């Protein structure tokens, strides 16, 4: 009788567990029911407002639940925010936009959690460096952007490539606890491995600190300044 009771209790637990698992999987699949054009427009709008990323709306978007719920975009392009002339500033082979799981029942409350960029090419001109420097003094999104296995192409005024930075991995976000913009990059230039770290406080008193280290050259540079 005790054995039957144990088996019965186990069966109830197993059935309950499987039932909850199926309900959870069904919940995770709800974004598949969202209208595709709505998803595309919503993603584009949220990327622009939260990350200042102007994504080309011709990109095709699919939804996946593994490793966690996200929209997957293959072969996308990022355009400049210049209203007069849209210039391609990056092409991304694989872009993953991870979602918060708080409320999939109400699509209007869809919230982005973080971004993952893989196999991307970024194109920068001399004037872009000043723009990036100005933007780095403003508050980043507190949602992380991770970049892996990508390249930065520096170009001159004739559109010729003068240098290539290969990115192994990089992260960019605003740390809510430390109240700091953080940007960390590990990569190489001219086949020389290096790490670059940037911290700044986008508050009333704006301070910026960066460090550059290339161990193979026995080179380490640090600088701190008020903006």
Predicted regions and their residues:
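N-terminal type II signal-anchor transmembrane helix
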Residues: 1-52
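Flexible beta-edge/linker motif
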Residues: 11, 32-39, 61-188, 215
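A short, amphipathic edge element
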Residues: 52-59
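Short acidic/polar mixed-charge low-complexity motifs
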Residues: 53, 86, 190-194, 219-221
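A structural signal for short, hydrophobic beta-strand segments that form beta-sheets
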Residues: 57, 169-171, 200
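A short, sequence-level motif marking secondary-structure junctions
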Residues: 62, 97, 198-204, 226-227
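Contiguous, well-ordered beta-strand patches that form the walls/edges
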Residues: 180-183, 188-212
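Short, intrinsically disordered, charge-balanced linker/junction segments flanking boundaries
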Residues: 211-212, 220-227
């Amino acid at each position: 009788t005790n054995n039957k009771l144990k088996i019965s209790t186990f069966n109830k637990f197993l059935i309950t567990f499987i039932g909850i698992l199926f309900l959870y999987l069904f919940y995770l699949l709800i974004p598949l029911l969202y209208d595709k054009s709505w998803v595309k427009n919503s993603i584009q709008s949220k990327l622009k407002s939260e990350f200042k990323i102007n994504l080309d709306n011709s990109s095709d978007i699919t939804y996946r639940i593994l490793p966690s719920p996200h929209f997957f975009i293959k072969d996308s392009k990022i355009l400049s925010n210049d209203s007069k002339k849209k210039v391609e500033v990056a092409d991304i082979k694989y872009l993953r936009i991870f979602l918060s799981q708080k409320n999939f029942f109400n699509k209007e409350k869809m919230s982005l959690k973080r971004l993952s960029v893989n196999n991307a090419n970024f194109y920068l001109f001399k004037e872009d460096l000043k723009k990036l420097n100005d933007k780095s003094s403003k508050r980043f999104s507190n949602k992380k952007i991770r970049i892996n296995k990508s390249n930065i192409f520096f170009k001159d005024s004739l559109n010729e490539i003068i240098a290539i930075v290969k990115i192994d991995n990089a992260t960019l976000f605003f740390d809510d606890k430390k109240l700091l913009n953080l940007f960390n990059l590990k990569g190489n230039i001219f086949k020389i491995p290096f790490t670059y770290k940037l911290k700044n406080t986008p508050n009333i008193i704006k301070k910026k600190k960066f460090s550059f280290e290339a161990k193979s050259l026995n080179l380490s540079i640090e600088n701190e300044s008020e903006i």
